[in-house]
From Swiss-Prot:
A biological-process GO annotation: cytosolic ribosome assembly
Protein name: Ribosome maturation protein SDO1
Record-stated family: Belongs to the SDO1/SBDS family.
Function (record text): Involved in the biogenesis of the 60S ribosomal subunit and translational activation of ribosomes. Together with the EF-2-like GTPase RIA1, may trigger the GTP-dependent release of TIF6 from 60S pre-ribosomes in the cytoplasm, thereby activating ribosomes for translation competence by allowing 80S ribosome assembly and facilitating TIF6 recycling to the nucleus, where it is required for 60S rRNA processing and nuclear export.
Any further remark recorded for this protein: Present with 5060 molecules/cell in log phase SD medium.
GO CC term, one of those recorded: nucleus
Quaternary state and interactors: Associates with the 60S ribosomal subunit.
Keywords associated with the record: Cytoplasm, Nucleus, Ribosome biogenesis
Molecular function in Gene Ontology: 5.8S rRNA binding; guanyl-nucleotide exchange factor activity; large ribosomal subunit rRNA binding; rRNA primary transcript binding; small ribosomal subunit rRNA binding
């Protein structure tokens, strides 16, 4: 819907507003739709490609431009670029209902894709499709929000699904390869690493060989512990972030 500006200014259409309240005053900038998130993520770095008008407003819909006195009082500067930067990074995006729903759908789809990629059925060793993940989360009354990264929400969803088990589900194991130098001097380290990694016969070398290597599966929750153990003493290579069974059965 167009926003009417005072005579002499262009009419703005397809506007996304970013609003920041400071010192009991409201400041707004007018942006192109879908450009704000790109700017915040660093995908778009040119403000001129984001802003419809390179100006700070008190009220965009009424065309009220912020004066220098208010900028100085509230932001400590009259530099419009500095004020715009702060509003862009700290302000709240004012979304229409349609924009909000589109963004929510995008976050939800991204979250479901992550959960599907990281989890498996412990019996079949196969992934669940996003549609089944979505249904399970609906039963658990888990709903995504637009102001939190999809990856973080995916991890929260996984934790809930694994704890409630309304469908049989576990985090898929990671496949890693560890190499430790001078293993004969570090038998305790080798033992600790071996307990974390589930390896098949032949996937680890003898402790007297230098370097000692071990390839196998590890629970993702133990990955940080493994990295800590190997810090400055060896290397950890991730061969597969989520091991699944790709075989088909007739």
């Amino acid at each position: 819907m167009p926003i009417n500006q005072p005579s002499g200014q262009i009419k703005l259409t397809n506007v996304s507003l970013v609003r920041l309240k400071k010192a009991r005053k409201r400041f707004e900038v007018a942006c192109y739709q879908n450009k704000v998130q790109d700017y915040r993520k660093g995908i778009e770095k040119d403000l001129d490609e984001v802003l419809q008008i390179h100006q700070v407003f008190m009220n965009v819909s009424k065309g009220l431009v912020a004066n220098k006195e208010d900028l100085q009082k509230c932001f400590g500067t009259t530099n419009v670029d500095d004020v715009i930067e702060e509003i862009m990074h700290k302000g709240e995006i004012q979304l229409s209902e349609k924009e909000r729903q589109l963004m929510l759908n995008k976050v939800n789809n991204e979250m479901l894709t992550i959960v599907s990629a990281k989890c498996i059925n412990p019996v079949s060793k196969k992934r669940y499709p996003p549609t089944m993940i979505h249904k399970a989360l609906q039963e658990l009354k888990f709903s995504p929000v637009i102001n939190k990264p999809a990856k973080l929400q995916a991890l929260e969803a996984i934790k809930l699904l694994v704890s409630k088990q309304i469908i049989p589900i576990v985090r898929a194991k990671m496949k890693v390869k560890v190499a430790i130098s001078e293993p004969s001097r570090q038998p305790e380290l080798i033992e600790k690493i071996s307990k974390l990694i589930a390896s098949s016969p032949g996937e680890s070398t003898k402790p007297e060989l230098d370097p000692w290597t071990c390839t196998g599966l590890i629970d993702p929750v133990n990955y940080r512990d493994l990295m800590t153990l190997c810090d400055k003493k060896g290397t950890v290579q991730v061969l597969d972030m989520a091991v699944i069974d790709n075989t088909t059965h007739n």
